[in-house]
């Protein structure tokens, strides 16, 4: 489909359908309780079947038969026959297990990373996965942080080279071709530098250090063609990354001209309330989408609140349509 055809499709969608399209839930949340979630707590979300029929993407359904069953049921119910996207974490291999990224980084070998990512793409694509939340571009220099092993290490140049190698292998020359998947670089930005090495903690650094040391790996991944970006959990410069116009709009959109979709991490829109920057789910949703966050993962504040926000004028229809277009464009690109 052309961009004009995708825009025409968006014009036919109701507001509720658009809000469902920019929401990602795991299979349990909309009627597939036998598919065990692979990550995160059960948030207790159970949504109306009519809304479930328009959900845009699924988190961590990792086998072909379940994915096919979900897709078939979804396409029978979705009023516009818009397919689901299936997304999953691939940390160090899918079925074939490789050394952790930190160990792979010690090889100083982009070709090793390419081979591991190529095999993971092959195995995951035939298991029904369209997008992986990988590679992790977070540069790490504090061994106390509990996710050090998911990073390629402490050097900006090496991280940049290895992230780009991983993206190239996941996506191939044409991501639509068999045995390839789209790459989502994470966690934007500087998630690997929390104070005291404590997970989810505040990241406090100058913007100069951010740009010189911590951003190059993400940018390298995007220059290699990564289709998506995941926003991080933490606070940077006193604003949570999931609601940061500086990170998600000024850097990603304005400076780097990134045109793809940006997704939250697990329930990070809801966590804006715990951060103290939003009074409730409505304000959290407004701040996130206004900052440039297209997809809400594993919470439903967009679905529950943004219809009212549109009526009140605190967000615009264009913001919503832009987010939906980015998602539909990726689905179209993946075939």
Predicted regions and their residues:
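Glycoside hydrolase catalytic-domain context in secreted enzymes
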Residues: 1-335
